[in-house]
Amino acid sequence: MEKGTPGFKAWDVHGKWSLRASVTSGLAFSDCEIPEENLLPNVVGLKGPLGCLNQARYGIGWGALGAAMACYDTALQYAKTRKQFANKPIASHQLVQEKLAWMITEIVKGQLLALHVGRLKDRGKVDFSHISMLKMNNVAIALETARKARDILGANGIVDDYCIMRHMNNLESVYTYEGTNDIHKLIIGEKITGISAFV
């Protein structure tokens, strides 16, 4: 679709609370006519344009882990240095250690999943359902890691001195774009049952 095509409109979206470092645009198509030379070659239906989603989803699976690690590292350092109750670091409390242990365990599991899917991809054996598992799992654990990190920091978890809320806001969008977790569950469900629930 070329700019200036009759019936095509695009506009910038302002006032975002998430993904603020990127430009987001709204798109509207009304009776647009696309010349034949602009059609994708050898493509039938949506499979061609949607094929790029696998690469994007794969990258998101890794990128979400970066946000999770930043939140975990922030929470760990904070917990080891923030002193409370008898001048002891809050890292000495059982519930704080439980949160930290959960975070690093889930992050490492996510890394192993991403590594496995990457190796399948390198060998040409990756399946779209593998990519859906990767995106769905890693974004969900990254978002939960951000929430647990925010809990550990208490009131400081919501201030811009720390990265947690920035990552949490962005992860809320990442949870939705390139396919919501519900869509990925349906993709995986179709793969394991052989029955499409998309009808």
Language-model features: where?
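C-terminal helix-coil-helix/basic helical segment that borders enzyme active sites and/or dimer interfaces
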Residues: 79-80, 84, 88, 104-137, ...
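Conserved catalytic-core motifs characterized by acidic clusters
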Residues: 13-16, 38-53, 77-93, 151, ...
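Glycine-rich phosphate/cofactor-binding loops in nucleotide/flavin-utilizing enzymes
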Residues: 153-199
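Alpha-helical scaffold segments that form or flank carboxylate-/histidine-based iron centers
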Residues: 91-102, 128-137, 165, 170
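FAD-binding core of flavoproteins
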Residues: 1-73, 182-184, 191-199
